[in-house]
Amino acid sequence: MIPKEEIMGIFEKYNKDEITIATVGSHTSLHILKGAKLEGFSTAVITTKDRDVPYKRFGVADKFIYVDKFSDISSEEIQEQLREMNAIVVPHGSFIAYCGLDNVESTFKVPMFGNRAILRWEAERDLEGQLLGGSGLRLPKKYNSPDEIDGPVMVKFPGARGGRGYFPCSSTEEFWRKINDFKAKGVLSEEDVKKAHIEEYVVGANYCIHYFYSPLKDRVELMGIDRRYESSIDGLVRVPSKDQLELDIDPSYVITGNFPVVIRESLLPQVFDMGDKLCKKAEELVKPGMLGPFCLQSLCTENLELVVFEMSARSDGGNNTFMNGSPYSYLYNAEPLSMGQRIAKEIKLALELKMIEKVIS
């Protein structure tokens, strides 16, 4: 892990009056960049020439850093450009996937918003389970081997995959049949199969809950809630059951979009309790803990119990559902507030209070 002192040494050389908020042009970059502009920051997007259209059309980026391929963002040349811009990078799922977690931890020497040490805890299932389980949250039962499957399960794989390759099954035989099908299609590799995560299939309504932890205010804030629109499962459910059987298609769970939802108000105490518990445990296990945006992906059972099956320890794709604010983020100051603007507000306040070390790593 890059020492905090080294990152702070880099930041000390910055012109504090000309800070740039930067991120990779993908995932949740639109509201990250727009939110930064609303708070008076200059913005920069890292992109390829064939994917720069949204950032030009929406006018959210002041500066463009072009790369031949997104994996180039970890190069020393790109890092130097960012440092020359006095950049603070806001990570999201695509940034981590393209830069590479090892590079984020060891070679990407540009100040980042949040705790870069916690990103591995969302990427590796065992660490994620340790953090979520240690927080006292209700989790699906975990199966250590395909041979243990004795009922409906969901099979997942590590990293920011957007649901690609996930599948349900009910037996060991079905597990291997679907694994071999996905391998034949090039969706899964042998390495993916070795890292398969098998968990109880919980029947319930899906709620992806977006929080923001402010180290400056020591407060967990509920920012919004979304559900995912997944292909091909959400298309298959529109097909009559008799035709589904004839089609004989194994559904996929690739996230193609999100839509906002609100949760039953009587469940909000449970929602806040979950966020509080996770932040408390994160501070114990991976100091300084969960800084800034994070997400708990959950299922609400018919008994009104929220079961957490996954977390994001950075800006999550569902934040895109409230670029102009959510019903929950509106309640704090009676004004629209996106996750991107909330991040920018925290950086701005940290600079004003001369406490930037609290929010970057």
Curated annotation (Swiss-Prot):
Q: How is the cofactor bound?
A: Binds 1 Mg(2+) or Mn(2+) ion per subunit.
Is Nuclease one of the keywords? no
The pathway where this protein functions is: Purine metabolism; IMP biosynthesis via de novo pathway; 5-formamido-1-(5-phospho-D-ribosyl)imidazole-4-carboxamide from 5-amino-1-(5-phospho-D-ribosyl)imidazole-4-carboxamide (formate route): step 1/1
Catalytic function, reaction form = 5-amino-1-(5-phospho-beta-D-ribosyl)imidazole-4-carboxamide + formate + ATP = 5-formamido-1-(5-phospho-D-ribosyl)imidazole-4-carboxamide + ADP + phosphate
What's the protein called, per UniProt? 5-formaminoimidazole-4-carboxamide-1-(beta)-D-ribofuranosyl 5'-monophosphate synthetase
Binding locations of Mg(2+): 297, 310
Biological process terms from the Gene Ontology for this record are: 'de novo' IMP biosynthetic process
Top-level taxon in the UniProt lineage? Archaea
Note the NCBIfam families from the entry: PRK13278.1-5 (NF009780)
Residues that, per the record, bind ATP:
146-208, 230
PANTHER family recorded for this chain? Answer: 5-FORMAMINOIMIDAZOLE-4-CARBOXAMIDE-1-(BETA)-D-RIBOFURANOSYL 5'-MONOPHOSPHATE SYNTHETASE, 5-FORMAMINOIMIDAZOLE-4-CARBOXAMIDE-1-(BETA)-D-RIBOFURANOSYL 5'-MONOPHOSPHATE SYNTHETASE-RELATED
According to its UniProt record, which protein family does this protein belong to?
Belongs to the phosphohexose mutase family.
* Record-annotated ATP-grasp domain positions: 116-348
Q: What does this protein do?
A: Catalyzes the ATP- and formate-dependent formylation of 5-aminoimidazole-4-carboxamide-1-beta-d-ribofuranosyl 5'-monophosphate (AICAR) to 5-formaminoimidazole-4-carboxamide-1-beta-d-ribofuranosyl 5'-monophosphate (FAICAR) in the absence of folates.
Gene Ontology MF: a single term: magnesium ion binding
Keywords in alphabetical order, please: ATP-binding, Ligase, Magnesium, Manganese, Metal-binding, Nucleotide-binding, Purine biosynthesis
Query: Mind telling me which InterPro entries this protein's record contains?
Result: ATP-grasp, ATP_grasp_subdomain_1, IMP_biosynth_PurP, IMP_biosynth_PurP_C, IMP_biosynth_PurP_N, PreATP-grasp_dom_sf
Cofactors (names): Mg(2+); Mn(2+)
* Binding-site residues for 5-amino-1-(5-phospho-beta-D-ribosyl)imidazole-4-carboxamide, renumbered to this chain: 27, 94, 258
Q: Give its E.C. classification number.
A: 6.3.4.23
